[in-house]
Design a protein with these regions (language model features):
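Divalent metal-dependent phosphoesterase catalytic cores across multiple superfamilies
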Residues: 36-243
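N-terminal export signals
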Residues: 10-32
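Generic low-polarity alpha-helical segments
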Residues: 8-11, 30-34, 167, 241
Length: 243
């Protein structure tokens, strides 16, 4: 991990890429709830977060990059008040974009995520979004965003699960901004990243840029993405993040 200073013009070009999201067609989502949403030829893909995932148990080992390399996966069956894992966001030209990531949901659980902002001391719901399968994520887009002020937010699921953070104002008064540049997050090293997170917090960057290889779990992509987000959630919760 390292930080760098970039001028505002360069930063605008970077953030135009948007936030950790990609477009999928409606036909793709027609596979919703399928035990093998990627087809019978690829039963190993996302096997720990699709189908009857809760029966798979904790501690399953997943294939990593490189022949014969495996590592235990983090548990996906978490307490239901903890299913809202994390969220990433960017904003530019009056548009706020956010992607909330949930742990896998069980049959009968609500498939909606809710975005709230704190205004005048009160939490106000502004958007609802479908939780997509496979992947267990929800996208939010807010138009006419006032980027001149910090705004507390939280993303909720059900009655108790939530992830809170802060939408930072646009640092337009700065001639230079600080960008934290991180990459190559090993999946062989389980657990948190407390030293990295603490050092990044000390730098207090305006923008986080994860340049690639957020996970090396090459068949369990959702597990790897959730693992990465949980490792860095305390720095991504209150600043724009590009992955």
């Amino acid at each position: 991990c390292y930080t760098m200073k970039v001028n505002r013009r360069t930063a605008i070009k970077i953030t135009a890429a948007g936030v950790s999201s990609f477009a999928l067609t409606p036909d793709f989502f027609a596979a919703s709830e399928a035990a093998e949403p990627f087809g019978k030829k690829y039963p190993q893909l996302d096997s720990l977060t699709t189908g009857e995932w809760w029966k798979k148990g904790a501690g399953a080992k997943t294939q990593l990059k490189g022949r014969g390399r495996k590592a235990a996966a983090p548990p996906m069956d978490v307490p239901r008040d903890q299913v809202m894992a994390f969220a990433v966001y960017t904003h530019q030209a009056g548009v706020l974009k956010m992607t909330a990531q949930l742990y896998p949901l069980k049959p009968g659980e609500e498939r909606l995520a809710r975005l709230e902002f704190k205004r005048d001391g009160e939490w106000v719901e502004v958007k609802k979004s479908e939780v997509r399968y496979p992947g267990w994520y929800a996208h939010f887009r807010v138009e006419n965003w006032d980027d001149s002020q910090d705004v507390p937010y939280r993303v909720r699921h059900g009655a108790k699960a939530m992830f809170e953070g802060r939408i930072r104002r646009d640092p337009s008064s700065k001639n230079e901004i600080i960008v934290a540049n991180l990459s190559c997050n090993s999946s062989r090293t389980a657990g948190g990243r407390p030293e990295i997170v603490a050092n990044v917090m000390e730098q207090d960057p305006d923008l986080l840029f994860f340049g690639g290889d957020q996970t090396y779990r090459h068949t369990e992509h959702t597990v790897g993405w959730i693992e990465f987000g949980m490792q860095f959630r305390d720095i991504i919760r209150d600043r724009p993040t590009i992955c």
